Every structure is written in C-alpha cells, then in structure tokens.
Amino acid sequence: AAAQTHLSIRRNFLEEAYEACEALDCDDAAMLREELGDVLLQVLFHADIEADRGRMTIDNIADAECRKLIFRHPFLFGGKNASWDELKQQEKGQKTTGEAMQGVARSLPATWRAEKIQKKAAKTGFCWKSAGQALDKLAEEAQELREAVQDDTNIDEELGDLLFAAVRVASTLDKDPEQALHSACEKFIKRFTAMEQSILASGRTLEELSREELLASWDAQKRNGR
C-alpha cells in the first residue's frame, strides 16, 4: 500500500461502495458477499496507508468507531435519553446550525447533501413545510432560470437553485430524491430502448428520423405505458 495514496485509490473506494449498493438493490446474497468484501478491502488499504505513516492502525479505527457508537447511543449503552443529532453536533464541536451544515460531507451525492442541509435548516423552522409551498418555490426558481437563460447570465447559479428546490419538494413528500432520480433514469432507458427497437423493427434507424418523428415515436411509447 506504500506506493498508493488515499487520493490515488479514492475512486476505487467509491466504485466498490456503489457496487455494494447495487447488490443491496438486487437483493443478491452472493453478489453482496463479494462486494462487501471489496469494500472491506478498500478500508484495509486506507488503514494500511495510515499505518505506514504512523498515524493510525485498523485497531485504532475500530476502537474509535466503538467509542463513537457508545457516545451517540446513550439510550442503548447508558440508559440515557438524548437526541442523536445533538450528540453528533456535540461530539464534533458544532455549536450552530451553520456549523452543522458545513459538516455535511461535500463528497456525498449532491441530492443527498442538499437533503441533509435542508433537514438541518428545517429543524430551526426555516423551510417550506408543505409540498404546495415547495412546488411554488420550484416554479419560482424555474422562472428565474428561464430569465437567466434569456439573459445568458448566472445560469449555473439558477440551475443549482432549481435543483436545490426540487430536492426540497422530495423532502416535503418524504421521498428520497436520489432514488427518485434513479427511477427516472431507469424509466428513460426502458422507454428509449422500446422506442429504438420499434424504429429498428420498421427498417429505419434513429439517425434517419427527424426530431419531430422521434418525439412522436417517444410519445407513442409513453402512451403505451412504457
């Protein structure tokens, strides 16, 4: 592991974690066993890098995790009743909501990060509480993006605001925005594949059709419930 660095194998860690999640989604025990092993191997790689630096070992990591679990779950280990979030903030030295927001990992998928930040804001009362309010905000942000596109200015900022507002809509509906987007991707792939197969069966290719013909074929698949 000495030839590697945390950054050089960072992508491997992410890929293995996502593959483990894929195994969970598939409810495939054999696949899950393999992928969890791969994740564990990545943990050991990173621990070995730190051991080479003399900063920590896998035993230190396991001990710290046990201590953290005991601290954050006093109702299980000490008979006390306390808020998990409050204990986490106390442990990390976070005194304000802003500090807690800054503590949300930047490496999270953006929809999850936005959701976590919004939930922390919601605990202070700063939020759109109903789906209707959140949808109104989404419409407002959509209009601001439209204006930004017309003016060719601040497009990235307004697009980000629109996506952030969409995450809040999901939260008010108690839905996982990341899962909702994954489902939309799967639906798009399924419908596009059906459209492509239909066009190929007619002896033509997608490239031969006009945009209007492609959209008409897409709408036909949509009406068929695909």
Task: Identify the residue ranges that each predicted region occupies.
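Flexible "arm" and connector segments at domain edges
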Residues: A2-E35, L41-L159, L163-R226
